[in-house]
UniProtKB/Swiss-Prot annotation:
The lineage of its organism: Bacteria, Pseudomonadati, Pseudomonadota, Gammaproteobacteria, Enterobacterales. This is UPF0250 protein NT01EI_2946. It comes from Edwardsiella ictaluri (strain 93-146). It comes from the Bacteria. It holds the Pfam family DUF493. SUPFAM superfamilies: YbeD/HP0495-like.
Length: 87
């Protein structure tokens, strides 16, 4: 994945992902599980429901150590079946 993030970020840094997915109970657990694989830590993600309640957004902040970690997490979070978008 070619991005300009590497030019914009100085590592290590805090990096927040916003993951939008179907409003299912396992969404938060699946997001945390993927993040734990690449950035082990103690996470308390923030969850906000959509206005109709069909979707949830999960915000989670990691301590990123290199650009490959950031890009890998974008890819793997997007591969979760019930995830619709990762920002």
């Amino acid at each position: 994945m070619k991005t300009k993030l590497n030019e914009l970020l100085e590592f290590p840094c805090e990096f927040t992902y916003k993951v939008m997915g179907l409003a299912q109970p396992e969404l938060v657990d699946q997001v945390v599980e993927v993040v734990q694989r690449h950035a082990p830590g103690d996470y308390t993600p923030q969850v906000k429901p959509s206005s109709k309640g069909n979707y949830h957004s999960v915000s989670i902040t990691i301590n990123a150590t290199h650009i490959e970690q950031v890009e890998t997490l974008y890819e793997e979070l997007g591969n979760i079946e019930i995830v619709r978008m990762v920002l």
